[in-house]
């Protein structure tokens, strides 16, 4: 694919890769003339030309319109060529709700733009439901911040996983210096915090870390968490749950945990490299129940050879356990995932049926969608949706997905974000991915992040 407009190259590629077939020839040219956005395409020898008009003010709005029309016109060509309509139409960004909020803030109905871009009525309704669920939580305030602690250790690596995580058995030698550096970084970050909205300890599987080391991190977080804000630990796989670790969380004010079975099929769990069974999930819930945590449970649609019936059973079992949150992810195979190396395609129709089932089943059992996001290489061009009982929505997930608060992130592979509302800019500061480099550079990492936040 070639284009004479460099900043559109990736955008147009993202549209093209929505489709299971790709044109052998795809060229694009753009010009703006006499108030019109002209886009011309050559797709496998067929010529297409479009002229669109729209009001804009300033360079930023011009770029947005330029991108919108180019993506829409290419999507229309390929949709007609292959006879396929995508559920999100020409939208390829990972945050549909963020675009919807922007339309609302500029005095427009977001559904008009979404319809124009070919988004299905079902997804327009889903977006509206998410925005409605976020009322009273969504807040733009320059002083707001969320806090992320990275514990990038797991019992083993799942077949579908692309995260930079380390099997705990192979990295125990790094654990003592890593914990010490993480404590130092957490405590040095105290001056960065003004209004703390939430704390999230993730990874990885934080419960893969020994209780003694987990306790050290919780003590350090106590020093920077000066209010009773939401406090989540993504405990993770149910086979690493212990009463000792759960009691530690309760003693340090943690009020929300994540249990991540992904499926209630023992056969599926075996295929994806999990070392636990569905029975371990029930045990983890039983252990957690006496501590009164708000619980999120993760499922993945599209796992190895799962049928709609398998996924339906996982949904039913999840609802039977009655967590406050259920998050339904669609399988997404990125570089670094073993399954991506072994699989050339995902069964998009089956995954789409699973998504449709979750949208029908969960609202009927007291859950509503409160946040969502999309990813590249996602089965069926679908989305990940967090479902919640009313009043139990996760602040951290909303803030991070809508990018409406600074994110102070500590630990290896942690990415801090600074949000500036005046110009809409979001800047990032990434820590080293590997443990050895992180440990060796901890002092410079602390100094750079403090400078990044201007403290």
Q: Where are the model-predicted features located?
A:
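Beta-sheet entry/capping signal
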Residues: 144-146, 198, 230, 325, ...
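Beta-strand scaffold of nucleotide-dependent catalytic cores
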Residues: 150, 258, 325-329, 398, ...
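A C-terminal junction/extension of Radical SAM enzymes
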Residues: 25, 332, 336, 340-410
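Short beta-strand motif preference
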Residues: 39-41, 149, 257-259
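Radical SAM enzyme core and accessory elements
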Residues: 1-106, 388-455
């Amino acid at each position: 694919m070639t284009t004479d407009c460099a900043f559109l190259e990736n955008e147009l590629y993202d549209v093209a890769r929505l489709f299971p077939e790709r044109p052998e020839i795809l060229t694009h040219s753009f010009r703006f003339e006499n108030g019109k956005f002209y886009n011309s395409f050559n797709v496998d020898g067929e010529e297409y030309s479009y002229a669109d008009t729209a009001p804009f003010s300033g360079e930023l709005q011009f770029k947005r319109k330029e991108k919108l029309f180019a993506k829409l016109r290419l999507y229309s060509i390929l949709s007609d060529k292959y006879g396929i309509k995508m559920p999100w139409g020409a939208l390829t960004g990972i945050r549909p709700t963020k675009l919807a909020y922007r339309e609302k803030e500029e005095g427009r109905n977001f559904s008009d733009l979404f319809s124009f871009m070919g988004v299905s009525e079902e997804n327009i309704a889903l977006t509206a439901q998410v925005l409605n669920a976020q009322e009273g939580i969504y807040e733009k305030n320059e002083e707001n911040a969320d806090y992320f602690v990275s514990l990038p250790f797991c019992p083993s690596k799942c077949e579908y996983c692309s995260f930079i995580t380390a099997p705990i058995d192979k990295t125990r030698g790094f654990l003592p210096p890593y914990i010490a550096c993480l404590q130092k970084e957490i405590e040095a970050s105290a001056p960065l915090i003004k209004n703390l909205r939430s704390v999230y300890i993730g990874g990885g599987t934080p419960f893969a870390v020994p209780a003694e080391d987990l306790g050290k991190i919780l003590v350090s977080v106590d020093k920077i968490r000066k209010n009773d804000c939401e406090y989540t630990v993504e405990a993770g796989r149910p086979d690493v749950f212990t009463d000792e670790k759960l009691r530690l969380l309760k003693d340090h004010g943690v009020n929300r945990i994540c249990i991540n079975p992904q499926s209630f099929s023992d056969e599926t769990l075996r295929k994806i490299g999990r070392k636990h069974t569905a029975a371990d999930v029930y045990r983890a819930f039983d252990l957690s129940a006496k501590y009164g945590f708000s619980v999120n449970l993760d499922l993945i649609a599209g796992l190895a050879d799962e049928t709609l019936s398998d996924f339906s059973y996982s949904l039913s079992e999840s609802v039977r356990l009655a967590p406050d949150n259920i998050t339904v992810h669609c399988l997404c195979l990125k570089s670094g995932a073993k399954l991506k190396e072994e699989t050339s395609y995902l069964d998009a129709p089956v995954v789409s049926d699973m998504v449709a089932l979750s949208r029908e089943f969960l609202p009927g059992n007291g859950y509503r969608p409160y946040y969502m996001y999309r990813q590249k290489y996602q089965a069926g061009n679908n989305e990940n949706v967090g479902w919640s009982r009313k009043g139990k929505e996760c602040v951290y997930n909303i803030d991070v997905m809508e990018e409406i608060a600074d994110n102070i992130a500590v630990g290896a592979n942690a990415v801090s974000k600074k949000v500036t509302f005046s110009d809409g800019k979001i800047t990032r500061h990434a820590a080293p991915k590997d443990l050895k480099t992180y440990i060796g550079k901890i002092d410079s990492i602390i100094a750079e992040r403090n400078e990044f936040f201007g403290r």
